[in-house]
C-alpha cells in the first residue's frame, strides 16, 4: 500500500499449508483429468503450436495429451478438424545425447511431426551473451539451462510456430527431483514442493518464458 509503505497479501493458496492437504486422498483419475483439462485449455489457438519434447516423463505426458486433442479444434468442442492437424514436437541437444533418442521414441509413439535440433559446444558458448541479455540474469544454472532452449526457440520461431507447451513445473508439483526421495516425512516433502513452486518464477519460468 502506498499510504503505509507496507506489503499486504490479498490472496492465499490454501494448499500451501500441510494441514490443509494432509488428509487428501490420492486419485490418479483426478490427476489425469486435471492434466488433460489444463493442456486442452492451452490448445484454444488460431496460430500454429507445438510441444517441447525432451523424452523425459513430464514433457512426454504433456505431449501425449496435446497429441490426443490436436486433431480437432478445441474452439468448436472437437466438432471440426483442426487447422493444423499434425502436432509438431521439438527436441534439442548435442549429437548423440540419450535424451534425443528417448524423444524420438516418444514422438513416434504419439505420432507427432518431430524436429531434432543439434548444436555444438561452440554454438552454445557463442550464444551465452545473447541468452544473458534476453533472460536478464547471470544465474549460472539458469543461463546453462536457457542456452539450448534459446537455440531451439530461434528454430521454432523461424518455422512459424507461435506457441509451445512444455513439462515445466511438474518436478516441483510432484516432487520429481531425486533429493525429494530423502524427505524425512510427508510434511517436509510437502513444504519443499511449496518452496520450489515459489521459486519457479525467478528461475525456470524465466528460462521458459524469455528464451
Where are these regions (language model features)?
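Conserved S-adenosyl-L-methionine
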Residues: 8-10
Amino acid at each position: 500500500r502506498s499510504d503505509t509503505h507496507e506489503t499486504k497479501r490479498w490472496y492465499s493458496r490454501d494448499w500451501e499449508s500441510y494441514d490443509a492437504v494432509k488428509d487428501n486422498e490420492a486419485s490418479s483419475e483426478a490427476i489425469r483429468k486435471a492434466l488433460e483439462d489444463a493442456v486442452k485449455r492451452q490448445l484454444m489457438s488460431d496460430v500454429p503450436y507445438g510441444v517441447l519434447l525432451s523424452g523425459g516423463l513430464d514433457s512426454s505426458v504433456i505431449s501425449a495429451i496435446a497429441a490426443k486433442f490436436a486433431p480437432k479444434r478445441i474452439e468448436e468442442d472437437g466438432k471440426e478438424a483442426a487447422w493444423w492437424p499434425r502436432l509438431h514436437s521439438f527436441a534439442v541437444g548435442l549429437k548423440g545425447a540419450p535424451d534425443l533418442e528417448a524423444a524420438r521414441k516418444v514422438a513416434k509413439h504419439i505420432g507427432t511431426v518431430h524436429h531434432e535440433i543439434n548444436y555444438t559446444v561452440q554454438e552454445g558458448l557463442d550464444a551465452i551473451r545473447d541468452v544473458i541479455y534476453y533472460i536478464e540474469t547471470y544465474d549460472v544454472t539458469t543461463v546453462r539451462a536457457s542456452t539450448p532452449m534459446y537455440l531451439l526457440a530461434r528454430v521454432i520461431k523461424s518455422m512459424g510456430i507461435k506457441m509451445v507447451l512444455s513439462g515445466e513445473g511438474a518436478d516441483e508439483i510432484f516432487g520429481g527431483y531425486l533429493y525429494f526421495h530423502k524427505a524425512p516425512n510427508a510434511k517436509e516433502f510437502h513444504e519443499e514442493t511449496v518452496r520450489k513452486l515459489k521459486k519457479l518464477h525467478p528461475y525456470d519460468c524465466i528460462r521458459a518464458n524469455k528464451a
